[in-house]
Amino acid sequence: MLFVLELFSHYVLHFERYFILSRQSTLLIQWSIVVLAGLYLLVHHPKINRQRTMFLAGVILRIVLLAGVSVELIHQVQSTNFTSAYLREDGKELLPLLHFLLYGYVLLTAFHYMLMPRDHGGKGKFYTFDLAVVSLPIVQMIFSFFSYWKEYPDGMEPIAFVFLFFIITLPIALNVVFFKLYWRTDKILLGLFYTLIIGLLVLLLAPYPNQISKDYGAVMPYTIYLAMAGFLMSYHLFQKSGKVYVRVNKWVTMAVMVFFVLLLNPIYNIGTAAFAVSKPANVHDSFNFVGEHISSEKAEQILKSFFPTDETLYLHDTNMDVHYFYSFESKGYKAEVDEVSQLIRNYEYLQKAHGKKLTNQEYKRKSIAFLERHGRVLHKDHIETKVSQEDGQTVVRIYLKNQLHKKDHADDGAVFYWEKETLMGFSEDPSIYQLDSLLHVHITEQDIHDKVEQMFTALNISKQPYQITDIESDSLLGSMVRVETKVGIVLEFEGESGCLHSLSLPMKKNISMANSRLQHQILSIFDARGSEKKKKSSQGDMVMYTDSSKTYEFVEAQGQLNVYVYSDTPDQSFPYTYRNGTLAYEKVASLYQDVIYKKRMRPIIVQRGDERHYAWLIIIQPFGSNRHDAYVVDGETQEVKSLYES
């Protein structure tokens, strides 16, 4: 039973995890189910006209559902430029509306049909209206096609018009066949109808071979129409089947009603019961930099400060929990902004270059001036600049110079792609900036100096020159500061906590895995707790130690003794049920100022240096915006912190 409840929890969370239904749509569906079920029980009273009441209920239900469609459209219009040309490029903007039609309109009207009397005379009107409503997304596809064709007349392949022909003719043909069968059953037409319905659903929904991807969002308008048409015909045939209908209709109707009420009532349903006992399994997602991520609005401001534009910047992948990097696009350019470091990468200008061709020296000066003009603080004594030609463009690469060892910098540094006087491409690299100017790096040069001095003392190594040779920054993978000494010792520090993450020593006579005294000297550099550390395992070229919070791994590889430190994940499974996650969301919602459009909860591990604890990540999308507000709620204390900077 517990397994079934856990399985059901994951099914319910699927709708949250992928932002399938908005909060407004979910409540509308839930309360409509309850009201229809209650009405079905009431109409059996002898003084109530069952046919008239259920007909009026059907009319009111469809008015309410169209109001729900309007709410979804209002949100989409407010949250993005809702144009046909844009929809043709990124059809995901219509997905919330399509999800509501599939899981709201089709589900609720089907439920209403199940509750209607067999001899009701208004079903034909409802059939016509419902098929017209679920055909609207297909009509939108057709208008979007012609809008895109008008804007990009050379971008259409001949095969696209063949697809357009089928998009237009198939629903028309199915509607004609449907209403012919509604008035008079014909076995040949019935076979043709179900062949088309089932065949098209299999074609649209069955997965293709691995090498071919399928966009289920793009085919959803047809999926909705086919599901509705298939249900209506099956229901119509069921009602016409005299003996079968009389024998099973009452019990089928009651079973369906009870199932949906138990499943979807908004007060206490099967999902609520499942959440009370089931816990997340295999929680591995960890989050750093809590309180330091930037919002999509801040990212857009940063991008526009570098590349001013009056055009709308579209934010892609708005269904993601956390972006890690924000991907924007306009007609003029596209670019990404890292959610933590606030650095720009993969900028690409999409229009023609202008101006005149400059000299290599002028391109160098323009590149450095561009960074300084936008507040970047270069480490001028430690950078080099290289100019090359690629595909007719002048490429300027600014990288951190390794003063101790020769290194190929072909893929390092900030890179500029110039064509004439136009910047056609650009990506930043934090390594070329002064350490104290990087907002996401919390270790100072003095901290690094102290740790290097501690290493020299602990290992009895004479002091020698060292330098920062690389700074990595990635919201998904974390940040790292790499330091190298003249003799090839490499230290890597975590950018957020400033802790030493790894140490690499060139193998020598006294530096090897066999030297147990050396192992303890190295552990002291990592500040391992002396009274608690113990050897966990030893095999061949690897030795592991642990203390109360960390694991230290010694590995010999390619002439180097490498030492890595890991913060131990708590041994126990995630200790909180999904009900605790719901309470965490309710606490966040009580403090939230805007109208909540969609929400999602996700179990995570919060990490900062040695500290690791379980928490809930609560994602909220406000109504009328594609912004995501993220909050971290401590699993034990229920303390709420915003993931984004204040």
UniProtKB/Swiss-Prot annotation:
| Domain of life, per lineage | Bacteria
Q: What is its main location?
A: membrane
What name appears for this protein in its UniProt entry?
A: Uncharacterized protein YlaA
Q: Where in the cell is it found?
A: Cell membrane
A single Gene Ontology CC term: plasma membrane
Q: Does the keyword Nuclease apply?
A: no
Transmembrane domains' residue ranges? 20-42, 55-77, 97-115, 127-149, 159-181, 188-206, 216-238, 251-273
Alphabetically sorted, this entry's keywords are: Cell membrane, Membrane, Transmembrane, Transmembrane helix
Could you tell me the membrane topology recorded for this protein? Answer: Multi-pass membrane protein
